[in-house]
């Protein structure tokens, strides 16, 4: 005889079957962080574990939160995203970094990739375009630019 299967247990089992990618958002603009956080929260495979406003804060948050992927602005006051990416990759080589740029300057994108980022996205792109890049970064170490 089949008994009823509690929906809560079913939900918990399904939820535990979905692999999650831990993401840290880094941008000196709190509105950008807020928009990205809300957008990424709609994907059950992604877990935004924290945010940071500076490169220095990003480095310490990586140590504290152990994200798999860091989505980071390139231009920030004090320690920029390029220097922070170098520091993070030196200390935590397994962490994947995706750069965000609001400038059309290819130098910044190239410098970010050389610092260890696996991709660089222009901030004018739809935040939804970031999702596949985060999924890819969370799963491998290949390099891409958009």
Summary of predicted features, one role per range:
Residues 54-57, 80-83:
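Acidic catalytic/metal-coordinating carboxylates
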Residues 107, 125-135:
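C-terminal output helix
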Residues 65-71:
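Active-site beta3 strand of CheY-like receiver
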Residues 45-53, 61:
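Short hydrophobic/Thr-rich beta-strand motif most characteristic of the beta2 strand and flanking loop
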Residues 19-32, 36-40:
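Conserved acidic segment of CheY-like receiver
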Residues 81, 112-118:
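As written
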Residues 77, 105:
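The feature encodes the CheY-like receiver
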């Amino acid at each position: 005889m089949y008994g009823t299967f509690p929906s809560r247990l079913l939900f918990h089992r399904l939820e535990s079957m979905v692999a999650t990618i831990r993401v840290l958002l880094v941008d000196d603009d709190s509105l950008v962080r807020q928009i990205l956080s809300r957008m990424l929260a709609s994907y059950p495979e992604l877990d935004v574990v924290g945010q940071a406003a500076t490169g220095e804060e990003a480095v310490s948050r990586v140590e504290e939160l152990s994200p798999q992927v860091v989505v980071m602005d390139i231009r920030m006051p004090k320690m920029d995203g390029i220097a922070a990416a170098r520091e993070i990759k030196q200390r935590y080589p397994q962490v994947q970094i995706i750069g965000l740029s609001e400038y059309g300057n290819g130098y910044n994108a190239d410098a970010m990739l050389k610092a260890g980022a696996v991709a660089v996205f222009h901030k004018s792109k739809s935040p939804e375009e970031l999702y596949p890049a985060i999924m890819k970064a969370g799963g491998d170490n290949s390099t891409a630019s958009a």
